[in-house]
Amino acid sequence: MLSSYRHQKKYKKNKAREIGPQLPLWAWKETAFSINQEPYWYSTIRLQGLMWNKRGHKLMFVKENQGYEYWETSGKQWKMEIRRDLDLIAQINFRNAWQYKSQGEWKTIGVWYESPGDYKGKENQFWFHWRIALCSCNKTRWDIREFMIGKHRWDLCKSCIQGEIVKNTNPRSLQRLALLHLAKDHVFQVMPLWRARRVTVQKFPWCRSPMGYTIPWSLQECWEMESIFE
């Protein structure tokens, strides 16, 4: 008996898909008002369709060179470069083996401190960018000038908007502060904390803070954040 299973769908590879019409924020608010919904109605519905565990970007192995394994995230717009020291991985002290590239320099992530102190914000830069790098929001065609006149990117979650602002402006600048205020009331989409920890390689640094995943980053923290991009 022949199997009844057939490949009924032919998937087109490398097909550029535009997600919805590009409309300014006021147009979505008027649409929501006309059907008796909240102003952020469409943003919420659209962003809920981004399944983190299926559509989110992942960490991929690149190469092994001079005692290091090099990895990078699969997203093209927000590509993070990470490496780990194979010599340290083979030892008990594997927690300090991971590094990420920031402004052309390698910084250690996942450090375990043996003496008491205030280490709360030591890893904020990595986890801030890591959350955005994993998110499946399409971060192309970002234009600060259009954003300032009200053409909000409705298909970006609040974390990705904050990330684009940090990437394109200087820390503690008036321009960044103004843009962050514009994005202050944008819809925040929760990303499960396990998503930050789910990678294809063992002994990856453990995310210890819910900031950016279940709790949005504050305006002050984004204003002071250093971008990893040159």
From Swiss-Prot:
For the keyword Plastid, the answer is: no
* Principal location: host cell
Q: Where in the cell is it found?
A: Host cytoplasm; Virion
What InterPro entries does the record tag this protein with?
Lenti_VIF_2 (IPR009979)
One cellular component (GO) term of this entry: host cell cytoplasm
Q: Which UniProt keywords apply?
A: Host cytoplasm, Virion
Where does the signal peptide begin and end?
Answer: none
Family assignment? Belongs to the ovine/caprine lentivirus group Vif protein family.
Instruction: Report what the protein is called.
Output: Virion infectivity factor
Q: Which organism is it from?
A: Maedi visna virus (strain KV1772)
